[in-house]
Amino acid sequence: MVYPVQCGPRERWTFARIQEVMDMPNLIEIQQNSYRWFLEEGLREMFRDISPIQDFTGNLILEFIDYALGEPKYSVEECKERDVTFAAPLRVKVRLINKETGEVKEQEVFMGDFPLMTDKGTFIINGAERVIVSQLVRSPGVYYNEAIDPPSGKKLFGATIIPNRGAWLEFETDINDNIFVRIDRTRKLPATVLIRALGYSNNAQVQELFDGDERIRITLERDNTENTEEALVEIYKRLRPGEPPTVDSARSLLETLFFDPKRYDLAKVGRYKINKRLGISVEREVRHLTKDDIIAAIRELLKLMQGDGRADDIDHLGNRRLRSVGELLQNQFRIGLSRMERVVRERMTIQDVEVITPQVLINIRPVVAAIKEFFGSSQLSQFMDQTNPLAELTHKRRLSALGPGGLSRERAGFEVRDVHHSHYGRMCPIETPEGPNIGLIGSLSTFARINEYGFIETPYRKVDKERGVVTDQIDYLTADEEDKYIVAQANAPLDEEGRFKEKRVNARHGHDILVVPVEKVDYMDVSPKQVVSIATALIPFLEHDDANRALMGANMQRQAVPLLRTDAPYVGTGMEFKAAYDSGVCAIARKAGYVERVTGDEILIRCDDGTTEHHKLLKFLRSNQGTCINQKPICHKGQRIEAGQIIADGPSTDQGELALGRNVLVAFMTWEGYNYEDAILVNEKLVKEDYFTSIHIEEYECDSRDTKLGPEEITRDIPNVGEEVLKDLDDRGIIRVGAEVRPGDILVGKVTPKGETELTAEERLLRAIFGEKAREVRDTSLRVPHGEAGKIVDVKVFSRENGDELAPGVNQLVRVYIAQKRKISEGDKMAGRHGNKGVISRIMPEADMPYLPDGTPVEIVLNPLGVPSRMNIGQILETHLGWASKHMDRGVLIEGKPSGEKGIRVATPVFDGATEDDIFEFLTKAGLPKANEIALTDTRTESLRESMAAVPLGKSILYDGRTGEPFDNPITVGYMYMLKLAHLVDDKIHARSTGPYSLVTQQPLGGKAQFGGQRFGEMEVWALEAYGAAYTLQEILTVKSDDVVGRVKTYEAIVKGENIPEPGVPESFKVLIKELQSLGLDVKILSEDEREIEIKEVEEDVAETAKELGIDIQGEDRSERAGEPASPDEMDDEEEIDYAAGFLQDALEELEED
């Protein structure tokens, strides 16, 4: 049963059988709500906590009354352009009261610029877009655990009270049923000592508290204190060893540790969890521990020891909570405020009371620094992944267990990383990185939301047990609430009234999957896709893919490069519109009205209220990852527009739907070994018609600074450079927009002053006669790096004179943007949505590709062996359905007769998509495969027609494009959605002739970024040894590596066309000799005729030659000057020793003379 639904402007035919009962929430609300809470509540809460600040005498009081955020100085676009932070000034109203005089001063104090969140849930920090990732941490509260003591096999129990900030309190038992307590991770004490210290002085009172429990009696026997005072002193000795204990200091220590709100904070969530776990009802406002908490915690531990309690599972999502932007910011702001508080107190005592004002007291530096540090360098403040809209969206919904106060990769075991039953509907079981972070970083599920305590909730439909009806009432449940109920699956069949059709249904209870009678069911899932995240919900036929491959599919969609021509998938899941809409890359109408004017970069809407709305579109901007951000209008003049409607497509969107790749005709067959190891064979048509062409924009910057020798200058006048090289530079020396550049071309001409050399008398005379010659400068222009090329699309110039804010010491800053059009090429990585990835091995002429009976050449050939062992069958079903929907006539679906309008788009939602039968029916309706239309000219007409009749549905006979012969077997063909991933061969290919060498080892540097060489490692040396390739090996170990003299002479010989000389001694060999000598071995090198070979330092002529040839043989020029060395820096070791000895000798002689 297939029916049409509207996905934005486009119609899709969906196979979903389950009606959606609720709309999906806004997908970035986790960021927005949290930040809104911070601005409205979080800030106020902190000022309330810190206020009032009193001096040590209690005479001066500083109160924070109210705060207000001003207007930001620049818009979001301007901030990106100027490299500044998108922030608003925070002003706080402060009151200073002098108790002696009764004087009250009120003032508004500026407390720094506070970064604001953009509409898209991001922050602009120093011009870069960043995202604050939510952190999954253990919730404050009380936790019980049990373990087995290995020798005795007895169960041991423990309890831990974890605060949001403050000292931990831990209880534990031993094999003799003693109960011990640890305060703040110190040595353990009998728990009764703590109970006495709380004011229950004698044994009778302690026994009475716990109804004379036997285990308390056993513990009392070990307790050598008699009353409260002794107990306090005993605790003080453990916490402050070496200090003289007094009862008062001990009492105040215990008070501050657990009962002082300033030093101990359970937070709202900690109090809620403790009350819930221990079944007590302390006021929600009391955020420190109370006596009742501690007594109740011990009672619960005793129950556990008797065998009628339960231990807690720390990986359960009821015990882990999220710290989102707001809370992370609040914690950081609190650190800044507490530092400021210290400064205020100090200033209160120092300053003169008469002239003191709030402004004088408050130093905002610590607050500003704390915020800046958080946004700039916290592990959770991340550079936004902006490869495509899905990458942006997923980044904002990411949940990380790493970061300050969280886990570390090394410490995290298997249990923490594993999928847990409480993840259902809250955290996606599929989407997580491969590699060391697996399971520590997750993604929020589609319908999940965060409650006030930071726990993740998921929606369920309430079942009315009286009437046996599934109602439309939606309840959001946290993980520990859900464990109490029995929850039916979303695919349980219901009738019109909402009653279950069957007597027994599949349901979940805790971690059990049960088949239960309908009467027992409490709740029902709202949607089949509530289990998975956005990226996973975009994979059609997910239910037919192995989880490991689905994980790769979900992750690789985030790496798809936005293409020049977008194309939404034929086979989607119905999520494409929502994902693109909420990612914020499309332009959305703010008000309803009619389109008055549309151009490439602006849309004007005449609104219903008579005003005109201008929508500026983003044109060819660079994203964080160097991909291209470009918006193009999808509305036309005179069109009616509603508020919230998409009026322009962004990158990777097509008619408002997410479009990460292209629909291509694929065939699953082997072809001449070109599909070996998942390689992909591609039709040249995809290159010619720009199917997978993308635009990449690189940014280069050049600044002129003040140096010791004078200012650098950006200019067209560069020494020793011909006019040919300068042809594209303007009169300022900056390249013009539209110029095509190649590696080594000058982008910005810049000269730096050279040090003036000492002049001889003759030169000074000539200078005096002929006037001052132009000062010495060297060329330090910005050039296009190796392997880069393209067109200049934008140039931005910032300078001090124009009043731009630049870094200290910088006078002018030039930014140049180079755009490249990258067509698909061999070595590029491509993938489908099912984890089926591969590298392009060959691009073939269209005429040579296998073709269908109607003459259509296949566009991509994939290896069939990549499917069975990987168990991602979803790709095959997608291929069949894609083929059918491409050829489906819309009229056949609506009225049952052809209308000539070919090609529809379908949606097959996850866990509720098309079945095998649906696909067969669809293929038949679309009239595939078309055996009877083939115009056969072959002699084997009849036999072929018979074999075509036997071709199963969804397959076709293919013909070899080179010979025209049919292939032996029918082959699966159809349309698959393929993505081009951000691992492009242009970014990886690299070659080096000569280049930089490491100063220490004299060997070439490594890596493309350093223009380095390829490492020829130990195993590669073995390979050459095995072949006996002695000369190749010698060359690799000497002149191609660290034989400093040899490589210069070899280079010279090649340049001059002479024979290559014998290699010399590598630098590493000299080090080896020195190391052996340092072990006390007398090692010499002898030649064949047993003469000792002296190892010399670099000769002067070698260095000179190198200079002439323009190669930097060493990081610095260490060749000595003729005659006596001017300073010890320029000598080798032996000379240095001689020099020092001589110097000492002279000094001694002088002393003797005195």
Swiss-Prot record:
Gene that this polypeptide is encoded by: rpoB
Pfam families: RNA_pol_Rpb2_1 (PF04563), RNA_pol_Rpb2_2 (PF04561), RNA_pol_Rpb2_3 (PF04565), RNA_pol_Rpb2_45 (PF10385), RNA_pol_Rpb2_6 (PF00562), RNA_pol_Rpb2_7 (PF04560)
A single GO cellular-component term on record: DNA-directed RNA polymerase complex
Annotated Acidic residues bias: 1127-1136
Job of this protein: DNA-dependent RNA polymerase catalyzes the transcription of DNA into RNA using the four ribonucleoside triphosphates as substrates.
Subunit architecture: The RNAP catalytic core consists of 2 alpha, 1 beta, 1 beta' and 1 omega subunit. When a sigma factor is associated with the core the holoenzyme is formed, which can initiate transcription.
Family statement drawn from the similarity comment of this UniProt entry: Belongs to the RNA polymerase beta chain family.
Protein name (record): DNA-directed RNA polymerase subunit beta
GO process terms (BP): DNA-templated transcription
The keyword Cell membrane appears for this protein: no
UniProt catalytic activity: RNA(n) + a ribonucleoside 5'-triphosphate = RNA(n+1) + diphosphate
Database matches in Gene3D superfamilies: 2.40.50.100, 2.40.50.150, 3.90.1100.10, DNA-directed RNA polymerase, beta subunit, external 1 domain (2.30.150.10), DNA-directed RNA polymerase, subunit 2, domain 6 (2.40.270.10), RNA polymerase alpha subunit dimerisation domain (3.90.1800.10), RNA polymerase Rpb2, domain 2 (3.90.1110.10)
Keywords, ordered alphabetically: DNA-directed RNA polymerase, Nucleotidyltransferase, Transcription, Transferase
Organism: Heliobacterium modesticaldum (strain ATCC 51547 / Ice1)
Keyword Cell inner membrane: no
EC number, UniProt record: 2.7.7.6
Listed GO MF terms: DNA binding; DNA-directed RNA polymerase activity; ribonucleoside binding
Renumbered residue ranges of the record's region Disordered: 1108-1136
Upper lineage: Bacteria, Bacillati, Bacillota, Clostridia, Eubacteriales
Basic and acidic residues bias spans: 1108-1123
